[in-house]
C-alpha cells in the first residue's frame, strides 16, 4: 500500500490545552476522515532500526502508522475488516495478532518487511479443526512466544493458548483455561492474570505447563465488573479496573496468594461517574485509558499510595458512558504514548513522567493517645481524601510542591487543619491529635396522632452531612441518640399503617426531646424500610430500594418522585453500571409486595402510586408486561398494566385507581408489582415504583408535574403559607385518612390558611395541578 503522509489529518499542540498535565500533544489523526472509522484498541511495534509504529484497531479494519517522527505520522498499512466495535492487537517479535468480535478470525500480520517495504503478508487463524473459533474480545502476547486469546466464541470464552515459536504465521493451540469467560489478561513468565468481567473477579493462573493451567487464586474487585489487570514491576501487587460508571483503579497485594487483599483504590474524577478502561504498568507509573477523561498517569512508586501526576483529555466533554479513550500504549523506547479515542481518533503524545509529593503519619486522640481509625485526611483540596486505618495510620499524596493545607476530620471530633511543606519525590511525616467533641443526647418520641399512644418499632432516619443514623423506637415509642454536631438534620420517620413524616431541624443540646406525630393511614415514599417483601426467580434486575442509578439509554428513572420525602424508590436492579443490559430483569420475574392493609373503614379506597417502565431492544420479540395486582387475602385481580414496546426514556407516570368494583374490601389488602423477562425472548426490561399511598378519593388530575411551591412554617402551628402563582386556582386540603378538611379558591398568588383547629399530623394540600405536604404540630 502506498504510504500516506497524514498532513491533512494531523493537528499538533492544539488539542484540549486546558485538560492536560505533564503530557504534550505531538499530533492527532482523525480516523473518521481517513477511513470513516471509530477506534478500538492500540498497540506498538519497533523494528530493528528503532522505527516505531502504532498498530491501531478500528471499527473497519487494522491500520499501521509509522510514528518514528511523532509530529508527522505516516500510515504504512491498512487491512480492511468486517465492521466491529472490538478490534484488539498485540505483538510478538515481528508479527502482529489482531482479534475482533466480527467473526473474521485472528488476523496475523508479518511486520518484518518494514521499513523497506509496506507489502506486509497476512494470514487468518481460526483454531484447529473441530475446535474452531471466529471471534474473540482481546489478545495478549507474552515474551516467551505464546499468544493468549480472551473471550473467543468457543466454550465459555475463557483463554486459548497459542504457541507462536515454530511458525508465527501459523500458531499451534497448546492449552485452554476455560473455567470462566475471560475479558482481558496479562502474562508474565509463567503466571497469567485474568479479568473475569461478568463474574466480577480476577484470577491468577500458573501456566508453566501450557496444556494444564492451574488456578492459584481469585479475588473480587470493588465494582464486581473486573475488566483489566496488570501486575506491578515487582510482582507483589496487581492493578485492576472495573468497567462501570464511577469505578476505581484498585490495587491488591498478592504476595500471599492465600491472603490477597486490597491496599489502595483511586478515581480520576470522583463524583463524575467516569469509567476507567485499561491500566498499564510502566516502571513506577500507571498509564490508564479512562474513557471520557482521556488518559491518566499515576505515580505508583508506592502502590499503596497512588498519586495522579499526568493527564490528557482526548474527549471534548465528560460523560458517564462509553465515550472517549479506549486504549493506550506507553511502551515505546522513545517514551511516546499513543492513545486511541473511539470517536476523536489517534493521539500521539509526549509525556513527562514526574513524581508526586507524599504525606504520611498517625492520628491519635488528645489526652488518651488512643489511635483513631476512620479519620478523613484531605490534602490540598484533593477530591479523594485518605482515611486512617485501625492503627491510626494514613498515607496520601498529590502533585504539588510547597505549602499545602491538610484537614483531618472524624465524626465526634473537632476538625483539625494545618499546613505542611511538600517536596516532590519525598515523603513527609505528620502526626496529629484530634480532640473529642462534647456529646449531647436527644430523644425521639413517636406517637399516634389520633390516640396519643406511643408507636413501637417506628423507623427513624437521621441524616447529617457526616452521619446517617437509622434506628427504631422501643415499646414506649422512644429512641435515644447521642449526637455531636449542633447543626441541621434531615429527619424521616414512619411505620406501616401511618403516613410518612419528614422534616428538617437544627438539633443542639437544648433540643432535648423531638416529638413526632404519625397520622394513621397507609403511605410509603420508600426512604425507610417499612416491610415490603420481594419474591423473585429472575437472575438479575431484582427489585431493590435505593437512590436510582441512571443508565446510558434512559432505561430507568433518573431520580425518585421529586416531591415526596427523601430520594429513594424501588427499582429493578440498581447497579452503578451504565450499560442498560447489565442489571435489568432477565430470566424470570421479580415481584414487589406490600404489607397488608385494613381498608374496611374506607368507603371509596384508592391506590395511588408512581410507576415507571421500560421494555425495548432484544433480538427477539419485545413482549414483557408490567402488571400491578391487588389482593384481599383470598382473591387477586389485575389492577393496572403497561404493555411494550416502550423505548423512550423511563418517566414517572401517576395512577389513582379505585378498588371498589374490583374485589371486596377486606382487612388484608395488598398491592403487588410484577415484572418479568422470560427466555427465550430476552429484552431490556426495567421498572420503578414510588410514592404509594391510600386515599378515600381519587387524585386523578392532581398528580401532574408540580410547579415549585414553598411552604412556611413547616411544621405549622396556627397558620401556614404557600408561595406560588395560585390566583383563581382551586385548592383542597386532606388529612392522612383522605378526608377533605378545607377547600376553596385562591384569591391571591400566595395562599395562607389557618390550621389552628386541625389535629396534629400530616396533611396534603392540592392547588390546581400541584400538591405539597406539610405538618401540623
Where do the PLM segments sit?
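Feature marking well-ordered beta-strand scaffolds used for ligand recognition
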Residues: 19-367
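Short, acidic Ser/Thr/Gly-rich low-complexity loop/linker segments typical of extracellular
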Residues: 368-373, 378-399, 454-456, 464-480
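Structural motif
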Residues: 359-374, 443-456
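Short Pro-Gly-centered beta-turn/loop motif in secreted/extracellular proteins
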Residues: 393-405, 411, 478-490, 496
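Extracellular glycan-recognition surfaces and repeat-rich motifs
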Residues: 42, 522-581
Amino acid at each position: 500500500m502506498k504510504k500516506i503522509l497524514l498532513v491533512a489529518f494531523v493537528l499538533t499542540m492544539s488539542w484540549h490545552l486546558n485538560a492536560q498535565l505533564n503530557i504534550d500533544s505531538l499530533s492527532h489523526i482523525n480516523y473518521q476522515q481517513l477511513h470513516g472509522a471509530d477506534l478500538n484498541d492500540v498497540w506498538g511495534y519497533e523494528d530493528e532500526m528503532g522505527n516505531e509504529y502504532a498498530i491501531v484497531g478500528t471499527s473497519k479494519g487494522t491500520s499501521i502508522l509509522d510514528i518514528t517522527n511523532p509530529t508527522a505520522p505516516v500510515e504504512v498499512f491498512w487491512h480492511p475488516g468486517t465492521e466491529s466495535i472490538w478490534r484488539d492487537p498485540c505483538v510478538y517479535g515481528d508479527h502482529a495478532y489482531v482479534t475482533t468480535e466480527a467473526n473474521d478470525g485472528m488476523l496475523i500480520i508479518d511486520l518484518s518487511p518494514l521499513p523497506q517495504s509496506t507489502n506486509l503478508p497476512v494470514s487468518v487463524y481460526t483454531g484447529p479443526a473441530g475446535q474452531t473459533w471466529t471471534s474473540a474480545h482481546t489478545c495478549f502476547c507474552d515474551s516467551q512466544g505464546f499468544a493468549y486469546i480472551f473471550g473467543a466464541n468457543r466454550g465459555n470464552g475463557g483463554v486459548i493458548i497459542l504457541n507462536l515459536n515454530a511458525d508465527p504465521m501459523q500458531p499451534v493451540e497448546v492449552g485452554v483455561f476455560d473455567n470462566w469467560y475471560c475479558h482481558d489478561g496479562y502474562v508474565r513468565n509463567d503466571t497469567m492474570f485474568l479479568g473475569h468481567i461478568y463474574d466480577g473477579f480476577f484470577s491468577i493462573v500458573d501456566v508453566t505447563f501450557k496444556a494444564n493451567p492451574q488456578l492459584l487464586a481469585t479475588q473480587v474487585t470493588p465494582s464486581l465488573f473486573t475488566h483489566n489487570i496488570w501486575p506491578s514491576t515487582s510482582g507483589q501487587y496487581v492493578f485492576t479496573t472495573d468497567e462501570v460508571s464511577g469505578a476505581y483503579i484498585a490495587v491488591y497485594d498478592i504476595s500471599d496468594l492465600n491472603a490477597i487483599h486490597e491496599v489502595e483504590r483511586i478515581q480520576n474524577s470522583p463524583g463524575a461517574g467516569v469509567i476507567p478502561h485499561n491500566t498499564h504498568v510502566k516502571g513506577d507509573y500507571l498509564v490508564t485509558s479512562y474513557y471520557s477523561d482521556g488518559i491518566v498517569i499515576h505515580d505508583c512508586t508506592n502502590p499503596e499510595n497512588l498519586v495522579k501526576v499526568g493527564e490528557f483529555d482526548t474527549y471534548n466533554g465528560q460523560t458517564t458512558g462509553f465515550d472517549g479513550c479506549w486504549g493506550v500504549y506507553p511502551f515505546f523506547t522513545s517514551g511516546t504514548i499513543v492513545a486511541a479515542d473511539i470517536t476523536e481518533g489517534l493521539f500521539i503524545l509526549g509525556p513527562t513522567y514526574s513524581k508526586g509529593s507524599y504525606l504520611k503519619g498517625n492520628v491519635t486522640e488528645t489526652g488518651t493517645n488512643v489511635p483513631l481509625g476512620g479519620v478523613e485526611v484531605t490534602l490540598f483540596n484533593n477530591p479523594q481524601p485518605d482515611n486512617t486505618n485501625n492503627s491510626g495510620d494514613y498515607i496520601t499524596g498529590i502533585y504539588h510542591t510547597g505549602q499545602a493545607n491538610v484537614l483531618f476530620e472524624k465524626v465526634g471530633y473537632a476538625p483539625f487543619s494545618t499546613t505542611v511543606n511538600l517536596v516532590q519525590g519525598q515523603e513527609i511525616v505528620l502526626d496529629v491529635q484530634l480532640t473529642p467533641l462534647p456529646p449531647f443526647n436527644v430523644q425521639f418520641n413517636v406517637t399516634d396522632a389520633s390516640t396519643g399512644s406511643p408507636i413501637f418499632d417506628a423507623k427513624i432516619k437521621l441524616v447529617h452531612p457526616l452521619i446517617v443514623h437509622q434506628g427504631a423506637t422501643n415499646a414506649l415509642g422512644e429512641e435515644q441518640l447521642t449526637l455531636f454536631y449542633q447543626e441541621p438534620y434531615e429527619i424521616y420517620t414512619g411505620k406501616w399503617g401511618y403516613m410518612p413524616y419528614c422534616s428538617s431541624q437544627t438539633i443542639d443540646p437544648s433540643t432535648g426531646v423531638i416529638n413526632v406525630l404519625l397520622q394513621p393511614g397507609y403511605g410509603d415514599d420508600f426512604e425507610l424500610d417499612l416491610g415490603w417483601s420481594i419474591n423473585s426467580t429472575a437472575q438479575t434486575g431484582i427489585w431493590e430500594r435505593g437512590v436510582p442509578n441512571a443508565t446510558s439509554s434512559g432505561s430507568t428513572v433518573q431520580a425518585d418522585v421529586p416531591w415526596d420525602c427523601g430520594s429513594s424508590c424501588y427499582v429493578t436492579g440498581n447497579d452503578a453500571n451504565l450499560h442498560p443490559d447489565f442489571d435489568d430483569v432477565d430470566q424470570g420475574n421479580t415481584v414487589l409486595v406490600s404489607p397488608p392493609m385494613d381498608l374496611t373503614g374506607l368507603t371509596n379506597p384508592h391506590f395511588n402510586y408512581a410507576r415507571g417502565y421500560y421494555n425495548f431492544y432484544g433480538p427477539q420479540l419485545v413482549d414483557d408486561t408490567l402488571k400491578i395486582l391487588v389482593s384481599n387475602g383470598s382473591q387477586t385481580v389485575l389492577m393496572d398494566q403497561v404493555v411494550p414496546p416502550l423505548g423512550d426514556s423511563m418517566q414517572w407516570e401517576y395512577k389513582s385507581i379505585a378498588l371498589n368494583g374490583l374485589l371486596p374490601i377486606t382487612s388484608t389488602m395488598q398491592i403487588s408489582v410484577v415484572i418479568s423477562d422470560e427466555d427465550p425472548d430476552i429484552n431490556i426490561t426495567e421498572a420503578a415504583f414510588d410514592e404509594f399511598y391510600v386515599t378515600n378519593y381519587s387524585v386523578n388530575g392532581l398528580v401532574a408535574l408540580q410547579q415549585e411551591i414553598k411552604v412556611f412554617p413547616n411544621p405549622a402551628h396556627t397558620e401556614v403559607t404557600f408561595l406560588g402563582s395560585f390566583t383563581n386556582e382551586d385548592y383542597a386540603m386532606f388529612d392522612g385518612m383522605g378526608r377533605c378538611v378545607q377547600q376553596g379558591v385562591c384569591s391571591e398568588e400566595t395562599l395562607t390558611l389557618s390550621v389552628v383547629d386541625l389535629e396534629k399530623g400530616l396533611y396534603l394540600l392540592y392547588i390546581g395541578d400541584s400538591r405539597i405536604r406539610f405538618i401540623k404540630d
